């Protein structure tokens, strides 16, 4: 059976105590005096931080993998260095959207040190035909491969995420391709219809308690319980409000992905 994602809506990281031997006067007369201490070696000058790589497209740039108007964006934070693997999230937009709409997450990419791949859906939304084997999943694969070939990505923190229609597709495809994407982020998603299940990805689900487009009782609450029953590691967050997503919810998802402490925005 073909599942079609057509829901509207997209919002909006000792000093060691010196060892002191209590030496009394009598002991001092009968013990060999200790050898003088060796003076400490001079401190080495601080090494300069690794410089940026000249061939890395820092900031936002086009994916450059589609001949059509629908392509997508790649965001590389200024903290990226070729010598250090960095977490990555493929972030999917909502209904009738563009990858460029994920620019709302670029500040979080800088804050937490995450590469963002933001492709455009092939049509008005994701998965309009043969989910799992459609043009969308092939394009997502090509976008991810380009990032992996050109950047040093952390293989232990590879996420597929999204909001609204993108969240439903991310949850479905993340479960189907859990041997590639070991983390899934679903925010205000309305569908979970994997064509198969591979691997055991960790999952972050967040949903608004008064979401009228994708009611929580039939989506977030239901999905998280089913996934927990199936043995998945699920982090679940409910937030007050409707289909729009508070910035702190997305911030918590990035903290979860990177393993860094979560602090609400001031």
List the predicted regions and their residue ranges.
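Histidine-bearing beta->alpha loop at or near hydrolase active sites
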Residues: 239-245
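Post-His helix in hydrolase/transferase enzymes
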Residues: 247-255
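Short beta-strand/loop motif that positions the catalytic acidic residue
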Residues: 205-207
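Primarily recognizes the serine-hydrolase "nucleophile elbow" in alpha/beta-hydrolase
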Residues: 156-199
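A domain-start/cap signature at the N-terminus of enzymes
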Residues: 2-4, 11-13, 17-87, 132-135, ...
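Serine-hydrolase catalytic machinery in alpha/beta-hydrolase-like enzymes
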Residues: 49-79, 83-151
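Alpha-helical scaffolding within the catalytic cores
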Residues: 100-105, 187-195, 221-222
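Acidic catalytic loop of the alpha/beta-hydrolase fold
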Residues: 210-215
């Amino acid at each position: 059976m073909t599942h079609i994602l057509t829901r509207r809506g997209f919002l909006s990281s000792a000093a060691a105590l010196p060892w002191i031997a209590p030496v009394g006067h009598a002991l001092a007369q009968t013990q060999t005096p200790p050898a003088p201490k060796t003076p400490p070696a001079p401190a080495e000058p601080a090494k300069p931080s690794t410089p940026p790589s000249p061939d890395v497209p820092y900031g936002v740039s086009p994916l450059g993998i589609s001949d059509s108007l629908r392509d997508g964006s790649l965001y590389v934070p200024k903290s990226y260095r070729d010598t250090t693997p960095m977490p990555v999230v493929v972030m999917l937009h909502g209904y009738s959207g563009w990858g460029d709409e994920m620019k709302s997450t670029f500040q979080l990419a800088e804050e937490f040190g995450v590469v963002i791949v933001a492709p455009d859906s092939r049509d008005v939304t994701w998965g309009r035909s043969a989910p799992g084997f459609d043009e969308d999943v092939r394009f997502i694969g090509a976008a991810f491969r380009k990032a992996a070939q050109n950047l040093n990505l952390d293989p232990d923190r590879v996420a597929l995420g999204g909001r609204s229609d993108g969240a439903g597709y991310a949850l479905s495809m993340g479960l189907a391709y859990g041997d590639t994407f070991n983390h899934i982020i679903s925010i205000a998603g309305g569908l979970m219809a994997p064509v198969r299940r591979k691997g055991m990805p960790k999952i972050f689900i967040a949903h608004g308690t008064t979401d009228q487009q994708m009611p929580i009782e039939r989506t977030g609450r239901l999905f998280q319980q089913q996934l927990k029953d199936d043995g998945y590691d699920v982090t679940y967050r409910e937030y007050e409000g409707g289909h729009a997503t508070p910035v702190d919810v997305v911030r918590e998802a990035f903290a979860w992905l990177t393993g860094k402490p979560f602090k609400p925005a001031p």
